[in-house]
């Protein structure tokens, strides 16, 4: 599951056990990322706080658009864990069983709306060559309808998942088997 071991839910500090337990209750399993990061509780708390501030916001980008950023950039970063886990969430949020695979495997060629294309293009630029970012790139995002706060969110989500992708590589984090079918088949 992780080359550095993991912590079971019942062995997590009380606050993390409650927080991760709520996710497990909703999904039916404990995502491996929480079990792996729980070996360093202060870091897991900081990660969850920033993750939730970015990914659970109802302002600006939709929750599906936020997941689109994660899947596209995790694909560019070759992060299997995040592609699989967030691909499941993207499939559920969009009710499209194919979108995550299409975005992760070929984000440049997948058919998207103009707004989604601008989000993916900006996220990929930040993920792969942020030093080359210009005002023209930001103007292209604005022209597609993104506000400055939404542009910020694209960059912040990309940055958070750059860290997450690299930790997943370092730890050899494996996706939970449950993620692979989520959003592909009707719920039982």
Predicted regions located by residue number:
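Hydrophobic alpha-helical segments
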Residues: 1-188
């Amino acid at each position: 599951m992780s080359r550095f071991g993991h912590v079971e839910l019942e062995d997590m500090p009380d606050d993390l056990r409650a927080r991760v337990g709520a996710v497990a209750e909703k999904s039916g399993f404990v995502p491996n990322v929480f079990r792996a990061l729980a070996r360093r509780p202060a870091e897991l708390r900081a990660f969850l706080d920033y993750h939730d501030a970015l990914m659970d916001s109802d302002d600006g980008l939709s929750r599906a658009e936020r997941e689109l950023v994660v899947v596209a950039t995790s694909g560019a970063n070759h992060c299997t864990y995040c592609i699989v886990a967030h691909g499941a969430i993207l499939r559920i949020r969009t009710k499209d069983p194919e979108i995550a695979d299409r975005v992760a495997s070929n984000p440049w060629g997948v058919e998207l709306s103009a707004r989604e294309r601008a989000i993916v293009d900006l996220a990929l630029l930040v993920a792969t060559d942020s030093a080359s970012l210009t005002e023209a790139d930001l103007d292209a995002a604005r022209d597609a309808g993104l506000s400055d706060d939404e542009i910020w969110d694209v960059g912040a989500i990309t940055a958070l998942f750059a860290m997450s992708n690299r930790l997943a590589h370092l730890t050899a984090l494996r996706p939970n088997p449950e993620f692979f079918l989520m959003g592909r088949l009707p719920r039982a």
